[in-house]
Curated annotation (Swiss-Prot):
Gene3D superfamilies referenced in this protein's UniProt entry, alphabetically: 3.30.160.20, 3.30.70.1660, Release factor
UniProt PTM comment: Methylated by PrmC. Methylation increases the termination efficiency of RF2.
GO molecular function, one term: translation release factor activity, codon specific
Name listed for the protein in its UniProt record: Peptide chain release factor 2
Transmembrane segments: none
HAMAP family: Rel_fac_2
Location of N5-methylglutamine modifications: 252
Pfam family, one: RF-1
Subcellular location: Cytoplasm
Top-level taxon in the UniProt lineage: Bacteria
GO cellular component: cytoplasm
Protein family per UniProt: Belongs to the prokaryotic/mitochondrial release factor family.
Main localization of the protein described in the UniProt heading: cytoplasm
Amino acid sequence: MEITELKREIQQIAARLGKTQDYLDLPALNANIQDLEQIAAQPDFWDNQETAQKTLQQLNDLKSSVEEYHQWMGQLEDLKAIAELLELEEDATLNEEAEANLTQLNHELDRWELQRLLSGIYDSKGAVLTINAGAGGTDAQDWAEMLLRMYTRWGEQQGYKVHLTEISEGDEAGIKSATLEIEGRYAYGYLKGEKGTHRLVRISPFNANGKRQTSFAGIEVMPALEEEDLKVEIPEKDLEITTTRSGGKGGQNVNKVETAVRVVHLPTGIAVRCTQERSQLQNKEKALALLKAKLLIIAQEQRAQAIAEIRGDMVEAAWGNQIRNYVFHPYQMVKDVRTNTETTDVNGVMDGKLDLFIESYLRSN
């Protein structure tokens, strides 16, 4: 990178950080931190543990924002120092270091700016993402498994913890359904736009004649809510609870004990299933928690079409309902039909590179 270009990039980052400082309002932020620290120092602070924990979480969030800003300012000063050295003497190693630091800092600022768009009541929560095979038979079940890998890879790349909480194997290949719990701040905010139908076009590996096949899978995304958030009372008469033997490959517990639990909320038809815990009781508790989260979100929306809008799998995973097309043949292209965002890097997308689509959706909304 030429020194003039480096200095121009540094000026642009300095301008971005100036806007960041204005947005944060550091004097007010520091005043809030002092107020919360005084509250936390009171002798009766832990008398109400729920309130105390929320206060500490708020305090930690504010401190993290301040520390993050100062860290970025430190990185900016380092870049300025490197630029001064490069003006005096060319150094390939220093130049590479400057480019790497610029890329990293720009990426962190992009991420921070994107998070400012996540202002929904549950956007900062973790996410529960469910995949259901739609129209397309065996190909659709294989497609559902490919999406399972894609979202798992995305979560891991973001530094989130990803847990598989339910899976139903396909008849010949792939999966009929699966549920991922993605732990981490803003996971729901980032993933909420993924709900809907995802369409795949490719040469079917399951067709002896090598014909092109179109397959569909439905994605549902819900926030992972804490116990204190789940203040939803569900009458027993509104629940239908069934148990089955855990499906899957291997394991001493598979197909021997009925540990899998399926819970249906009869008034709405919402169904959840959990298979991954070792006991029936644990699976029942997890399934009920997820059901409560879904009902709570629907109540928050207070719209007649709330279920259809919040639950991606309520729209039939079939032709005409897709939010995104993944074309492997006769050309390679992934295109979001809502934002017209597209890329030819099909392999990258299937390996979890979804930020292009996530960011364009958030900005469009």
